[in-house]
Amino acid sequence: MKRTSIFVVVCSLALLASGCGHDVYETAFAGKRESDAKYVGQAVGNFTADEWYPGGRLGTTLNVTEGCYEDETPAVNEMGLDRAFNLGEAAFERNFTINTAPFKGLGPAYLRTSCLDCHPGYGHGKRQDYYKAGYGNGYLLVIYHPADGANSDDGPYVAEVTGMPQTKAAAPFLPPIDEDRIVLDWVPVTAMESGLPMTFPDGEKYELIYPELSIPEEAFNTDPTPFQTGNKAVAFRLESTIGIIGTGLLDAIPEEDIKAQYQAEAPYVALNPAFWDKDANDFAATAWYTLAEGRFADGTPAPAGTKKLKRFTYAMTRASLQDGAGANAIWNITNVSRRDRPFLYTTKAWAKAMSENPEVIAAIQADPSSPYHADGTPEGIADAVLHLLDPSTNQFDNEWHNFEPEMGDDQYYNFLVWHRGLSIPRARDLNRPEVQRGKELFSEIGCASCHRPSWKTKSDNYWAPAILDGKPLPRYEEQTIWPYTDMIQHRLFMKNGIHGSWCRTTPLWGRGLSKANTGAEDRLHDNRARNVVEAIMWHAYSKESDAYRSTEKFYYLSAEDRAAVVEFINAI
């Protein structure tokens, strides 16, 4: 549960420790710390007064202690949405069960029992040494047919398991993937593909690791398996869940301002053609997401087919936060249905395999109360299983068994209030000269080109689904926010990189408090970076990386200046 503390004095944050000789980051500024409490809200050095409030006055919590990621925004308080926020928080934190109210409906196949499993401490997951779907493991499996038939980062998702593959199932069903057969190894990088040495000019070393994931064909409880379809080559990647704090503020960034950012970057770096038409100097047709019927914050109806610019997830597959990763995940991670989600998150290949499994059929036949029991014959049960597990079957209106929505409209509304109402902790230590120096260097070496410091929210005329019936959500009008992202995808060309190659620039705000909130400070899309320095240096693994030149400049900084950049990143 959240812990609220107003005008608290920031606790001392430990500097980065890479475990590979980075003592300089531990000691560079030891003994020089002064409390920032008396400076909060004041202009100091090269920081404006507003920069203490990364989420603006309506989106920032002054709490910077353990648990601050859980805090609601001042907008929630001002709009009188505290009760809805707290009830929505419960939906995020509690374990869903198969049939015990109020959090029921788990399965038949699922990824986790709780959102908190993937977002421990409201963070983005911790690096794991093995794959088990439990608390702290924020990893999602990525399974696809590699375009090169080997291990390319690119290629279409396999169709036999869901896009976010499931490793759990409610009895008597088998999970689509047997997680006991998943093998995860972390491999040390012995040399940078770019040729950049793995020792800084002053003698300090850095280490990098990357994941290798393998899943044998026998682990798949589907018919057919992915190894029998497509090009019959199957590749695997890991993606850790995205950060959730402050996402309502990102939803409030105007589309026209994001377009201006694309136009500003397009002359200097190749942008994803799926999002930007360079010749037209405008968004590509595939940059737009088609929404269901809804309503805008000002009360204007939004008919089905309304288009919004994609901006959420690494792959930028979602537009409005209210139909974004969290709104989707509360359904597909648990497979909990609601009135506007009458279909299961499953595949036809899994449904077929379960309908053909004699042990599954026998278990259902022995339980006449099962919704899959049908006429009680093996043939009737198999037919019911095949169709009721099929992702195209309306669970509330079919000829085999009509289920009821498992999440109520009010529950879903409360969840969206919570999701849009999560705050960003205030900045820390902006009064310190080394943090001010880090800010200067961050801009000078080019990091701010992609990690754009600030945006303005304007009217925040958000879209909301019709199921909310016009109920208000937290709104962030006319706020200056400091997320440090350009809201655009770039490519880093890492070893065993992200599926699809393109990844949206991750916001840096609040990440310096990850250790205090989650117990870990892992970074990048698969948590391969164990600290800030490793995250930075992965940007220079390949000379093809969009960030190679900036990272090369970081590499040649003095040890004290490198430490200043780290201090700055941990402060914002």
Describe the function of each predicted region:
Residues 89:
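N-terminal cofactor/phosphate-binding cores enriched in small/glycine residues
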Residues 1-7:
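Bacterial N-terminal signal peptides that target proteins for export
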Residues 17-19:
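C-terminal motif of bacterial Sec signal peptides marking the signal peptidase cleavage site
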Residues 7-15:
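Hydrophobic helical h-region of N-terminal Sec-dependent signal peptides
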Residues 24-86, 96-416, 420-434, 439-572:
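Electron-transfer interface patches adjacent to heme c in soluble/periplasmic c-type cytochromes
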